[in-house]
Amino acid sequence: MDIEEVIEEALQKIVPKEEEERFVKTLMSEIEEKARETIEELNLNAKPYFVGSLAKNTYLAGDHDLDLFIAFPLDTSLEKLREKGLEAGKVLGKKLGRYELAYAEHPYVRAEYKGVKVDIVPCYDVKSWKDVRTAVDRSILHTKWVIENLKGKNNEVRLFKRFLKGIKAYGSEIYVRGFSGYLAEILVIEFGSFLSVLEKADFMLKKKIIDTGKWMKKESEITMKTIKREAEEDKPLIVIDPVDPRRNVAANLSWERFGLFYFSSMQFLEKPSLEFFFPGEKRGNYREELKRKGTHLVTLLFTPPKLVDDLLLPQVEKTAKGLAKALEIEGFKVFGIDYGRNFIFLEVDRVEKPRIEIKRGPLYFTSHGRRFYEKNEKVWIEGKDLMAEKKVGGFIVEVLEEIFKKGQFSAGKNVKEVIKSSDILIDFVPKPLANEAYLFLSREKFNVKRSTS
């Protein structure tokens, strides 16, 4: 198929049909009515707003998660916003059906209505970037800006989003670090179409800075501060938020995820295929990978605290890195880490090390030498120096248990204690993690060399 045929076939799969559009519009209308009823019943000075892809009509067929914001006036205290916003969320959640509490910057409600997940989030009713008080406030401005500037390019955005999902580069969550939906929308608006964005992959990396909102002309000093800050942090892309010059929309985008986009764009333009949008699942045998590489897999299994992924997974990542560093100090070579809500993978060179360490001590005729002599069990002389043999745990499980016991590793504050009581598995993972282990060991997660067969 040529590129136009591939795009047309992709569109057939990702653009909502009329029946689905009617369902979404009816759903939003019913939820909005219930939200207004709730606000009135509680006698709140607040307004309901829909934000996100459903509100912008850039959602993919079958993807109906809905974000409803309860916006309070700017003179509302943060404490009152949290209290009343959560109260409204609970009452509305009960009307919609079942709900649960979730936690981010402040608590919010996750409900479900007619099979669709609905996040009910309190925020401030901001009119400009200068009004922003909490991290979620901009979402209202984002939705309004996209609707005003998209100008019929909804399906171009859908193509780009599905492409990013297919190449595993979609999602700005801290544990993904890919392209957010809003970033995808900005790039389509900036460059005009899905294909134009792909064609500009190399250009935007070299240009580095995208200022669709023309903030350099309107707020040059603030914008330059943003650019300087982000450049110092070596971000692959700086996209000044069209509604707020203080923010880089691509702040969470990692070099790895941009790299997937960079190579996939080049490959798709050279050899278009529906596979980029809808790839087959990569599967393999992690045991075969271990045999091929001659390395070992250490798996930590633990029961995670009840936190949303945005709060939990960065802490698990920090812990995985801390354990890797601790093992390196102990003499093991760590080739890579991976993690999830309840596991950490560490690929290491070996699982056994010598059970003794040789320590070089002070000169034998000094007071320090006397203390060294008294402290150690097996002591000998090499030249003027005292030497000693220290017993250490040789098996990596023993080493990790000693690291846990002493707490000698960097870890997320909410996960350190549960990590200490982890089950430690060597070269084996439970069946649900088998393919995850394969993807990690084979490095397929960030593989940019596609098969040409």
From Swiss-Prot:
Catalytic activity: a tRNA precursor + 2 CTP + ATP = a tRNA with a 3' CCA end + 3 diphosphate; a tRNA with a 3' CCA end + 2 CTP + ATP = a tRNA with a 3' CCACCA end + 3 diphosphate
Family: Belongs to the tRNA nucleotidyltransferase/poly(A) polymerase family. Archaeal CCA-adding enzyme subfamily.
Protein name: CCA-adding enzyme
Taxonomy of the source species: Archaea, Methanobacteriati, Methanobacteriota, Thermococci, Thermococcales
Binding site residues for Mg(2+): D65, D67, D119
Known cofactor(s): Mg(2+)
Subunit structure: Homodimer.
Enzyme Commission code: 2.7.7.72
GO biological-process terms attached to the record: RNA repair; tRNA 3'-terminal CCA addition
Encoding gene per record: cca
UniProt entry tagged with the keyword Cell division: no
InterPro entries: CAA_C, CCA-adding_arc, CCA_tRNA_nucleotrans_2, NT_2-5OAS_ClassI-CCAase, NT_sf, NuclTrfase_I-like_C, Polymerase_NTP_transf_dom, tRNA_NucTransf2
Function: Catalyzes the addition and repair of the essential 3'-terminal CCA sequence in tRNAs without using a nucleic acid template. Adds these three nucleotides in the order of C, C, and A to the tRNA nucleotide-73, using CTP and ATP as substrates and producing inorganic pyrophosphate. tRNA 3'-terminal CCA addition is required both for tRNA processing and repair. Also involved in tRNA surveillance by mediating tandem CCA addition to generate a CCACCA at the 3' terminus of unstable tRNAs. While stable tRNAs receive only 3'-terminal CCA, unstable tRNAs are marked with CCACCA and rapidly degraded.
Stored Pfam families: CAA_C, NTP_transf_2, tRNA_NucTransf2
Amino acids binding CTP: S53, K56, H142, K161, Y170
Sites where the protein binds ATP: S53, K56, H142, K161, Y170
Misc note: A single active site specifically recognizes both ATP and CTP and is responsible for their addition.
Alphabetical keyword list: ATP-binding, Magnesium, Metal-binding, Nucleotide-binding, Nucleotidyltransferase, RNA repair, RNA-binding, Transferase, tRNA processing
The organism of origin for this protein: Pyrococcus furiosus (strain ATCC 43587 / DSM 3638 / JCM 8422 / Vc1)
MF terms (GO), sorted A to Z: ATP binding; CCA tRNA nucleotidyltransferase activity; magnesium ion binding; tRNA binding
Cell inner membrane as UniProt keyword: no
